[in-house]
A protein has these predicted regions:
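Post-cleavage N-terminal segment of exported redox proteins
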Residues: 1-9
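Sequence context surrounding c-type heme c attachment/ligation sites in exported
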Residues: 10-59, 88, 93-186
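Structured, soluble extracytoplasmic/luminal domains of envelope-associated proteins
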Residues: 44-84
Length: 186
């Protein structure tokens, strides 16, 4: 299934990103460990979640479900929220590497300065008050907000960008990234 904007699938366990991000201060890379190293962001295993939740959350129905999956040695069948077509290869690591670090906010990225600049449209997804000419420090976990939105403030994860080819091509153009077909279609 493909979900529209401002909606997402029902999940087998209601996972509160708000609790983990806002209250506990965890960032995306704590659970999605491969996002800055590999093509995929990876969903943490039941065993990974139980590392904390074997002792935390005794009064929670959702954590009881998690513990049941663990006891039965069953993976959680999470429903995918963000999806690109099968013929598209999106490499998370390359995008994290490109967008993270100290960046000068510009209207359009200069091809010769791609490692030190970020387009205003992308910067304001991370820092809503960003302005052209400012230097911002973009953490790896903040890069996720460019395409996924502020998941840390979502009680239920939903898609906030179309993730269609035109959206990707526009972002590549704004950031002087390659736009030839084989960049994403191989």
């Amino acid at each position: 299934d493909i979900y529209g904007f401002n909606e997402g699938p029902e999940q087998p366990i209601a996972f509160p990103h708000t609790k983990h991000v806002q209250e506990l201060g965890l960032d995306c890379t704590f659970c999605h460990r491969t996002v800055a190293k590999e093509a995929s962001a990876s969903i943490p295993s039941v065993e990974f979640c139980v590392t904390c939740h074997k002792i935390i959350g005794d009064n929670s129905e959702e954590i009881a479900k998690l513990r049941s999956y663990n006891a039965n040695e069953k993976p959680i069948d999470w429903q995918r929220v963000h999806r690109v077509p099968d013929h598209v290869h999106f490499v998370h690591e390359a995008h994290i590497r490109f967008f993270s670090g100290s960046k000068n906010v510009v209207n359009t990225v200069d091809r010769n300065k791609v490692s030190s600049q970020i387009a205003l449209d992308d910067a304001i997804r991370i820092y809503p008050n960003a302005k052209v000419g400012e230097i911002i420090d973009v953490k790896e976990s903040q890069v996720c907000m460019t395409c996924h939105g502020d998941v840390g403030s979502m009680t239920k994860v939903k898609q906030i960008r179309p993730l269609k080819m035109a959206d990707c091509v526009n972002c590549h153009r704004d950031n002087s990234a390659p736009t030839d077909c084989v960049t994403c279609h191989y």
